[in-house]
Amino acid sequence: MRKTLIGVILTIVLCCSAAGADHEAAEDVAKYRQSIMKALSGHNGAIRLIVAGKAGDPDRLADHIAAIAGLAAEVNAVFPAGSNLEDDESLPAIWEDAEGFAEAVARFEEAAGALHGMADGDVQDIDAAHREMGKACKGCHEEFRVDD
């Protein structure tokens, strides 16, 4: 009887520990995801300012574009199943409609790739490609992100 009780208690403790570890892992993934999205936002902002001639070094424009292209390839991977948290800006639709989300991310990746292809072009072409990428970003945010 005593061994059974100890076994039950250990099972409960281990299950609770595993659940806590899963939640911590989901929180870490969410923090990483938020870092990636903030980095994308930062590079987007830098591109807007440089293209508008308001701030920044035009010689660094290609660096910001390359960073976005690199980060874009990671977006789909930072939303694994089980990483949705209640206080996250990510809507459950990401996981409920994984195929639709993957398609939206693919549109963003394609637009980021097109922008990357323009990195050495003139500012007007870069601006046009950047605006197209912005539409892809907005499309994803409208369906899969909590309103700001």
State where each predicted segment sits.
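Positively charged n-region of N-terminal signal peptides that target proteins for export
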Residues: M1-T4
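Short Cys/His-rich "knuckle" micro-motifs
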Residues: D148
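A short structural micro-motif
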Residues: L14, L71, K135-A136
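Bacterial N-terminal signal peptides
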Residues: G7-C15
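Extracytoplasmic c-type cytochrome modules immediately beyond a signal peptide or single-pass transmembrane anchor
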Residues: D22-R131
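The canonical Cys-X-X-Cys-His
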Residues: M133-R145
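A short hydrophobic/aromatic micro-motif that marks alpha-helical segments and, especially, helix-coil
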Residues: S17, A112-G113, C137-K138
